[in-house]
Amino acid sequence: DLEGLVIPGEALRPICLAVGGRHMEIKDAHYLWGLDVQHVGKRLRRMFPGSGHRSILRIGPAGENGSAMACINADTYRHFGRMGGGGVMGSKNLKAIIIQGTESFDLPESKAYPKLFQSVYEKMTATDMMSKYHNLGTPVNLEALNELKCLPWRNLKQSTDPEISEISGEAFADETLLRNTACSGCPVGCIHIGFVREQFDDPHHFLYRQVNYDYEPIFSMGTMLGITDKFQVLSLMDEVEKAGLDVMSAGVALAWATEAAEKGILSEKETLAPLVFGDAKPYAEAVRHLGAGANDFYRLLGQGALKAADHYGGADFACVLGQEMAGYATGEVFFTAQAHGLRHSHLDSGGYAYDQVHEDKDPESAIDFLVRDEAERAFLTSMVSCLFARGVYKKDLLSECLGTLGYTVLADSMDDIGRTIQALRWRTRSEERRVG
């Protein structure tokens, strides 16, 4: 069994790596270099059959060009989105990694396992615990955060706008939703696939493209850019997907560039398109330029909004918390958590949720919560758990699941292991700062 895959060095030419239970192959991929994420996926699925037993990780032009906001696409609808993993693959001339499963694990023979499995399955599918994620999905949060004045609009010049009704979770579901799908083996179906229709010939010849949507992409390609047409938002998401960019960093960086253009810091000479809040067409061009590193400005912006601001000016309105902010303007605890976390990720602790339910402004209580919540999430993440299911996999249930599988020592040590992982993360962060 492979527990980890480490790929040192750099290939002499573009390659893809195919890994299976009994094989590891390096295949020439020069003909894939320069292709967008979607075209690469189509070709690789034909080359490596085995849907449901195969995972394809791939990058787009942004990764090839070394962008710090290049993502790694995982099986089309999911991503290693943040921290520039796509740029790391690109630096190695590694266009894709294909992992093919050939074996299965034996299930426990005890009567406890099927009984517990059924209980967990019912929690996932027949209770309210996960219904939010299946029904409207994470976009259900858009209207709620907008009402609380916690939703970033137009580079955070506003935190609420009545036009949210045009791009709410309900609006996307009513007018754009094609279907739900799920990660392999998951019964929830939280992936929401919308459609974009495009006329390619007169009089009535259309094609449609399928685009997955969630809260964060709608924030970054919608509210942050002032776009309130849901189909335009989906079209921008589609451009981001093809380029292989992290949608949050791309949207927030372009929002900064738009305000910089408003203030006269940037001109169309740099942006190559007239960026204006609410105008989707120039943003589609800008996303392509950002992925391609079309000029000096876009190559610098691809290293992060602060990098560009350091060169051109405008750092005071760059919405960056270590990396471009996530879609929450909930308050001090969220801002602190993302700014100081190891990955500068809103998912490392629930600071955004803490702000919404605590008005006491007590720093000690907030810090205690962040430390405790980070350790619990670190353990869940190390289990390769979906954080959407954290409400189901509470400590007692997770311990019972591990025990039923025979991992009794692990089941009895979850708190200690979570704190150990957390300590390793903090040590890594300290070492990064010393090197930096």
Language-model features: locations:
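Extended C-terminal regions of large enzymes
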Residues: R45-M83, M89-S430, R434
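Acidic/Gly/His-enriched mid-domain segments of enzyme catalytic cores or analogous surface patches
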Residues: L17-E64
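Hydrophobic or amphipathic alpha-helical targeting/insertion segments
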Residues: L2-I26, G86-G90, I97, D106, ...
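Short secondary-structure transition/capping motifs
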Residues: G4, A29-W33, L225, A294
